[in-house]
Amino acid sequence: MMFDLTGKVAVVTGGSRGIGRSICEQMAAHGAKVVVSSRKLPACEEVVKGIKAKGGEAIAVAASISDRAQLENLVAAARKAYGQIDIMVCNAASNPYFGPLTGLKEDVFQKIMMNNVMSNLWLMNMVGPEMAERRDGAFIIVSSIGALVGSAHIAAYNMSKAADLSLVKSLAMEWGKHNIRVNAIAPGLIQTDFARALWENPQIRGAQESKAALKRIGQPDDIGGVAVFLASKAGAFVCGQCIIADGGVIGSGAE
């Protein structure tokens, strides 16, 4: 029963597709009540429909991570529906720029940092106090192995994800004394719509598959299970950490 989430309420941003959808589905399968959120309500409702078809419980709430008021509404809607929030998964992110840093415009970089870093801090400050009052909670940020390496294509995105890892360590120091576990997941290249520009590029995909110990890129469910671990009793002593789930790219020694 170490992975049982029965009675827990999980809020997942970017939950309508890819990694976020898998996290929603896997947490529901392990007993959690799930609040599925992304910008587009119909896409969230489709995920909810699938969860309910398998006997799970979920609701859909549209929210953009770029808008603090919408995130406040998301948190309020979750509390109204289920009374509390036990698990917060910050999966939503944006990467509007693919190319060298020489072509990166300042406003685009600011948007990346606001969406990918500041929104996570907003959410922690929204849900942290109630978790602290109960002395129980799991706060998970989906980062990326891009946080650990340089890139000629998505450097701005990588910088934001590196900032998330630093944020996790600091939040863990602030909130850990209240038994709130703050952790990150760093996925490798996952076959999602978000990463389509990477895995549809034969050279980039081939390089990743060659470097990976498992010789493949990842699938969304490869990450969903990691999130369940961090949210459950199985991860009760894990705090301030980043779990790398990349098929063995980082640390493989491949050049």
PLM segments and residue spans:
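Active-site helix of classical SDR
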Residues: 124, 160, 168
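Alpha-helical segment proximal to the catalytic Tyr-Lys
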Residues: 129, 173-177, 236
